[in-house]
Amino acid sequence: DVDAHLEAIAAAHGPFVVHLRGTGTFRPVSPVVFVALARGIADCEQLELATRRGPLAGPLRFPYHPHVTVAQEVDDDALDAVEQELADFDGTFEVTTLDRYVNDEDGMWRPVRSFALTGPAHLTSDGTRP
């Protein structure tokens, strides 16, 4: 059961901080511009690794790369404009939930359920708590 799987993951992982800074792109492989993570990468990778086991195991189309997509499947001029406009973006937020979405028949992603991250906080690379 997917919900039981996600509940167990959320219980094993604590909240963490994500710091977003600057932009990047997956072009020419994929027409995507994203805001890059400067902090929280390891926490995202741990959640991804845990999630892609059991009922959600399966091959990836691309290697996992934590990011926030801000533009995709638009023309190159629009991608260039977004990448330049957000180049100096800098923001921080706390991740407190793992959320399950479904992709409906109309192609829209819709939230179904949130799972609170209630596990212990992981240590950062310098040995401190986030």
Language-model segments: which ranges?
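Histidine-dependent nucleotide/RNA phosphoesterase domain, centered on the 2H-phosphoesterase fold
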Residues: 1-130
